[in-house]
Amino acid sequence: MRTLIATIAVFTAMAAAAFVLTPRAVDACAGLIGSNGSVNLGRTTTLAAYSGGVEHYITAFQFQGGGGEFGSLIPLPGVPTKVERGGDWTLQRLLRETAPVGVGGSGDASGVAAAGGVEVLQEVRIDALDLTVLKGGGADVAVWAEEHGFSLSPDAPEVLDFYATRSPIFLAAVFDAAAAAERGQVLGDGTPVHITIPTDNPWVPLRILGLGKQSDEFVGADVFLLTERQPAWLPAAGDGLFLSYYGQATDLLLDDLRADAGMGWMPETAWLTKLEVGSTAGDLKYDLAVDASGEGRPSFRSAGLIPLPNTGGAEDDASMPWAWLAVAAFAALSISLTGLRLVAGAVRR
């Protein structure tokens, strides 16, 4: 039986993969258990870039050993227009750009009805990855996963519902380690994936990174944002989410990114933000909602900080003015004390 893990990515690359959906015979653990052995998961790195009303979610699936097949599930904010192989150096270049000072194929939309009420929107093969874009409710996606040989962890129904009520779109990725070995992929080799999604604002799933983990297990990830204006986001940087870079992207960086495969859409100017996730799975109950418009009003609902109308509680972001005041004050303090210091460090470089 396959093992299913859920990733960002980020995306982001928004990224990618750090949630473990374990086989029924195995308890949840920090590593991924494949059908023929153990596959270790590294730190997830994701880019969520936003330009012209389109999110470019880029993440990488990395082969780190083991055999058989395993998979991941990435919630998406909308229906992608394209799923293709990502560039060769985009994520690495971003990591280098934001290092601390002094430290050195597109698929066809098929619209095929699948069992359990899930609609298969796209199917794409990239190297040893089989990628499927699904549309359906949380329960339907769970049925689809089990019918395709995956075993779900006990917390999967709650987590899948958490996402499906906001956007019923998921990307299922199946990685065949045996096929990767046949292709000559070695330990540490990664397959970058670039997902193009029209959406009102960029969004990065974070809660999914704790899927299948014990509540006290550590979850770490790097999330890069590239936006045409200075972004605002929820939740504000604080416990478990740390702002490590916030400043205007340099012309050299943008030129380097633009030269990578599939990155010609890169804008002439952009604001670069790096957020680091460092949290226990039990505390990671939110996603990263971004307002890229410059108005400074990211969505509480997209961040998963308020319940949807059918689950009770506040019905929309506008109903929480007190929360907006608190977030504005906290965000301003965070950016003033952390972001500006990081910009100064970037200038010194």
Language-model region placement:
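Surface-exposed, glycine/proline- and aromatic-rich loop segments on solvent-exposed faces
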Residues: 42, 49-98, 145-167
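C-terminal segment of classical bacterial N-terminal signal peptides
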Residues: 14-25
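Bacterial N-terminal signal peptides that target proteins for export
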Residues: 1-11
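Cytoplasmic C-terminal tails of single-pass
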Residues: 344-349
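A cross-kingdom signal targeting lumenal/periplasmic-facing segments of multi-pass membrane
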Residues: 80, 84-127, 135-141
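A mature extracytoplasmic/lumenal domain signature
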Residues: 61-63, 130, 135-138, 177
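Covalent nucleotidyltransferase core used to form phosphodiester bonds in nucleic acids
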Residues: 110-117, 121, 135-174
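Accessory, solvent-exposed terminal regions and/or long lumenal/extracellular loops of proteins
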Residues: 27-44, 51-53, 79, 152-331, ...
